[in-house]
């Protein structure tokens, strides 16, 4: 069964410390594709977006994490929450649907290494 495409907002996180991020909205996302396929699709799309500043286009992104599910409560964290990584970071070999992505889900897209450094010392610099 083919899924209908859904709308997903992806927050490109360039810097956790400086709270530097840009949201990008994707329409028609197939929930039956693997997380890794969606990551490749986003990475291919980012350099083509005229609305994104160069630093966002050149940054390395490799990890998706659920920020907000539709009809759920939002966290107070301005960039991305640091809790529940096991549940909220999307495993590359699962489908988006199996990972809990639905219509109007918000995801953070970031460099996992940067996230680990920030998580060890979550201090904002602005």
UniProtKB/Swiss-Prot annotation:
UniProt-listed InterPro entries: UPF0538 (IPR018794)
Lineage top rank: taxon: Eukaryota
Regions that span the bilayer: none
Family, as annotated: Belongs to the UPF0538 family.
Protein name: UPF0538 protein C2orf76 homolog
